[in-house]
Amino acid sequence: MRHGKKDNHLGRTVTHRRALLSNMASSLILHKRISTTVPKAKELRKYVEPLITKAKADSTHSRRTVFSYLQNKDSVKELFDNVVEKIAARPGGYTRILKTGARIGDNADMCIIELVDYNETYVKDSEVKVAAKRTRRSTAAKKDDSSESTGAEPQA
């Protein structure tokens, strides 16, 4: 019986799945954004977010624990030196999954999983939208403006 076993096995053995998630987590930390299938991205999110939370406490024990999951010195160094500084104030939700449609060969649902604070396009768009907001004028003000611009005076 599989009561309470809600992890997606991704059609792999336990060791193959651990290696897959470890490699994908290292790639995500190093490149900040990777393209993959939706089920893999959802499993990767469950795998990498606790590692990022653990990296906030920069201690020897947390470094060794994260290294036991990632097994890549470069990605551990990147995580503790650069990524944690940027997400220090965030209480969780360090990754974002953006669906990109179906893959051409086998129609698999594809997506992009990325670290939230590293996407500059969303940050710039939100700042521009805040600056571009204007108040709306009433229709009466528009009628007054149009009558003044034509030179016609309203009759009393």
UniProtKB/Swiss-Prot annotation:
Biased composition (Basic residues): 131-140
UniProt cross-references to PROSITE patterns, sorted A to Z: RIBOSOMAL_L17 (PS01167)
Transmembrane segments: none
Keyword vocabulary terms for this entry: Ribonucleoprotein, Ribosomal protein
Gene3D superfamilies tied to this protein: Ribosomal protein L17 (3.90.1030.10)
GO molecular function annotations of the record: structural constituent of ribosome
Record carries keyword Ribosomal protein: yes
Domain of life: Bacteria
GO BP terms, alphabetized: translation
Family, as annotated: Belongs to the bacterial ribosomal protein bL17 family.
Listed PANTHER family: LARGE RIBOSOMAL SUBUNIT PROTEIN BL17M (PTHR14413:SF16), RIBOSOMAL PROTEIN L17 (PTHR14413)
Protein name: Large ribosomal subunit protein bL17
